[in-house]
Regions:
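Conserved ABC transporter NBD signature motif
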Residues: 98-106, 118
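Short catalytic/signature loops enriched in Gly
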Residues: 3-4, 10-16, 30-50, 55, ...
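Conserved ABC ATPase "signature" region
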Residues: 23, 37-47, 105-106, 157-175, ...
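P-loop NTP-binding/switch modules centered on Walker-like glycine-rich loops
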Residues: 18, 206, 210-214, 218-296
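Conserved ABC ATPase signature
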Residues: 180-184, 188
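A short, proline-enriched helix->beta-strand linker immediately N-terminal to the Walker B motif
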Residues: 199-203
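Hydrophobic anchor residue at the start of the ABC signature
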Residues: 143, 194, 218, 222
Length: 352
């Protein structure tokens, strides 16, 4: 099978709620200079000259569209840039390059004041339910804070009524509003975080590994709650996770990240059935399967993930790629996302 050259994977569909174009997020750091050989141990280098500037390329040149009403899963190993991308899309982190559009409005360079009316339409559910809630605020104050900031309620009584309604929607009793976060379990705290995210009736929610810190027995409850809320409120999700089974269950489409770049993007069913990128194939081979007839042979990748400070030239995955007899382009030419015969987009020189 051959690629279809006419298709442009970067062409935004008409129903795209969020459009990301060539977005990068790099963090400047300073590295220690290597100590000159032969320098006596008692000789100390000046701090001004003992460190050299460097850049962590957390997210690089990402193109992505999130369609209205869908759940786009974002998967990859820890440290690949998933959470950084989610926060950059919401402008919680400032992009180093590229453009971000929300509902056809370019928000990339908007001032915080101009962006404020859009904030209520874009929310985030954080990974750690223990750290994302202010321990000095009651649950009611934490949920109702956004209502006051965006002037969505006219009185304290209206705010209390709205908070009680939100608590009921996430399966908590109204009297929880008078209690503090430390009085709740992890699963209950995450429900509070979800209620807070829904307070302003958003259209787009970034779910940043919302179940990774929870017990397995609680994870399914939170996923089912998110699905019910999406159906009721017509929400659009970016669901970030490293749990491939959960992502398969909840997602309409799935994007796979490696070292700050999207390497594959496809409908969930197609990606899990016939992954095209060698990295995606290796990821899915590690997913446990109950039925021995559906088990894949485990693909073991050599070495470690390269440093995002100095990513490899060409395809960043080539030092670990299990494909034999790789073409020269893998070592020298950066692969771009291209549409394959089945509609999957893959950034790979050998994928078909």
């Amino acid at each position: 099978m051959t690629a279809r050259p006419a298709a442009d994977p970067r062409a935004a569909p008409a129903d795209a709620l969020v459009s990301v174009r060539e977005v990068s997020k790099h963090f400047p750091i300073k590295l220690a200079w290597p100590r000159p050989p032969g320098l006596p141990p008692h000789v100390r280098l000046w701090r001004a000259v003992s460190r050299m500037p460097a850049t962590v390329q957390a997210v690089t040149a990402v193109d992505l569209e999130i369609r209205r009403g869908e759940t786009l899963g974002l998967v990859g190993e820890s440290g690949c840039g998933k959470s950084t991308l989610g926060r950059t899309i919401l402008r919680l982190l400032e992009p180093s390059a590229g453009t971000i559009a929300f509902d056809a409005i370019d928000v990339t360079r908007m001032s915080q004041r101009a962006l404020r009316p859009l904030r209520r339409r874009m929310q985030m559910i954080f990974q750690d339910p223990y750290a994302s809630l202010n321990p000095r605020m009651t649950v009611g104050a934490a949920i109702g804070e956004a209502l006051v900031i965006h002037r969505l309620v006219a009185s304290a009584a209206e705010r209390a009524e709205r908070v009680a309604e939100l608590l009921a929607r996430v399966g908590l009793r109204p009297d929880a509003a008078r209690r503090y976060p430390h009085e709740f379990s992890g699963g209950q705290r995450q429900r509070i975080g979800i209620a807070r995210a829904l307070a302003c009736r958003p259209e787009f929610v970034v779910c940043d590994e919302p179940i990774s810190a929870l017990d397995v027995s609680i994870q399914a409850q939170i996923v089912n709650l998110l699905e019910d809320l999406q159906d009721a409120d017509h929400l659009t999700y970016l669901f970030i996770s490293h749990d491939l089974k959960i992502v398969q269950h909840i997602s309409d489409r799935v994007a796979v990240m490696y070292l700050g770049r999207i390497v594959e993007l496809a409908e969930a069913r197609a990606l899990y059935r016939t992954p095209k990128h060698p990295y995606t194939q290796a990821l899915l081979s590690a997913v446990p399967r109950i039925d021995p007839k559906t088990r894949r042979e485990r693909i073991l990748l050599p070495g470690d993930v390269p440093s995002p400070i100095e990513p490899p030239k060409g395809c960043a995955f080539h030092p670990r790629c299990p494909v034999k007899d790789k073409p020269a382009a893998c070592f020298h030419e950066l692969p771009r996302l291209r549409v394959l015969q089945n509609g999957t987009q893959a950034a790979c020189h050998v994928a078909e």
